Each structure stands twice: as structure tokens, then as C-alpha cells.
């Protein structure tokens, strides 16, 4: 792809100057899939108007379905970020990241650690689903919400079954 940084591939970490991860990955992935999800985007950075984050969520005009992976630990901030994404017509689908195993994320109680905090997990899900439903109704479209989960934080903290049941 002409706008891909030298040496980039579908799994590389994005250079903020190169645009969204999808612009690099889509031309390099030989697959018929029509849905490509962004790399994890922090809800707080979206709500605070961080320019790098806003650049990451701007969809490419060639995308048929715009899907965004959202991360956060505060239900109100997550709901505001989801509402903003729908109102600005930046996504057609929101995927909540409850699967990131990186210690930097799990130490803050996010990613794969969130399903362990069942009440917070359910509050986050409910707040984002409600926000997407309300903003989607105002925009005249339906915004599906999905979740990314892992088996658990580690082998002694398996949460996948409870998380999946809660997310239904």
C-alpha cells in the first residue's frame, strides 16, 4: 500500500503518521472478509479529544463496514466515547476489548482483568450497549456491540464462561 510505512505488515504497531491500522492491513491481507476491527482505542483519549486517537478512528472511505475496538474501565466514559463515535458517524460496530493480557492494561483493572470484576464488567457492557442503541436510533441505524474476551487472566482466574453469559 502506498501509505504504509516501510516494513509494515498487518501485525505491526501503527505509526500515527501512517493513518489507521486498517489502511495498512486491508491491502496486505488476502482474505475475503468484510470486517476489519481497529487496534484497541482508549475511550478516555477519545472523550478528551486526543488527536492521535481521533486519527486512529477515522475510517478509510474504502471500508465497507467500519468496526472499532474500544477499551476503558469507566462506564460513563465508555458510554460517552461510544456515543461520540456513533454521532460522528465513525463506526458501524463497536467491539469492547476485555481480552488484552498486557500487564500495563491489566494492572489498571482493564482488558483481561475486567471480567474478573463482574459488576464492573456488566456495568461497562450495559452502558456501551445503551449508548450505542440511543445514538444509533437518533442516527437511524443499528450499532452492534461485541466483546473480545480470553479464557481468563491466568489459569487460576478463568472468566470466559461467566463473561460470555453476562454479555448475552
Which sequence ranges carry the predicted segments?
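Glycine-rich, positively charged N-terminal anion/phosphate-binding segment
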Residues: 1-88
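Glycine-rich, aromatic-flanked loop segments that form ligand/cofactor-binding clefts
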Residues: 33-49, 93-94, 114-117, 121, ...
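Conserved radical SAM core fold
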Residues: 41-47, 75, 98-112
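Short glycine-enriched, charge-decorated loop/helix-capping segments at active-site entrances
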Residues: 53-55, 109-115
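Glycine- and other small-residue-rich loops at beta-strand/loop junctions that grip anionic moieties
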Residues: 70, 113, 117, 148
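Alpha/beta enzyme core
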Residues: 79-108, 118-168
Amino acid at each position: 500500500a502506498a501509505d504504509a510505512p516501510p516494513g509494515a505488515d498487518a501485525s505491526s504497531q501503527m505509526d500515527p503518521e501512517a493513518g489507521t491500522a486498517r489502511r495498512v492491513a486491508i491491502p496486505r491481507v488476502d482474505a475475503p472478509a468484510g470486517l476489519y476491527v481497529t487496534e484497541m482505542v482508549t475511550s478516555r483519549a477519545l472523550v478528551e479529544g486526543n488527536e492521535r486517537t481521533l486519527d486512529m478512528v477515522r475510517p478509510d472511505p474504502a471500508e465497507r463496514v467500519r468496526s472499532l475496538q474500544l477499551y476503558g474501565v469507566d462506564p460513563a466514559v465508555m458510554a460517552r466515547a461510544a456515543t461520540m463515535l456513533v454521532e460522528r458517524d465513525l463506526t458501524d460496530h463497536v467491539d469492547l476489548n476485555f481480552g488484552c493480557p498486557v500487564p500495563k492494561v491489566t494492572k489498571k483493572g482493564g482488558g483481561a482483568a475486567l471480567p474478573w470484576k463482574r459488576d464492573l464488567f456488566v456495568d461497562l457492557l450495559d452502558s456501551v450497549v445503551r449508548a450505542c442503541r440511543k445514538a444509533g436510533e437518533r442516527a437511524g441505524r443499528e450499532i452492534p456491540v461485541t466483546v473480545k474476551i480470553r479464557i481468563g487472566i491466568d489459569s487460576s482466574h478463568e472468566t470466559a464462561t461467566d463473561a460470555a453469559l453476562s454479555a448475552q
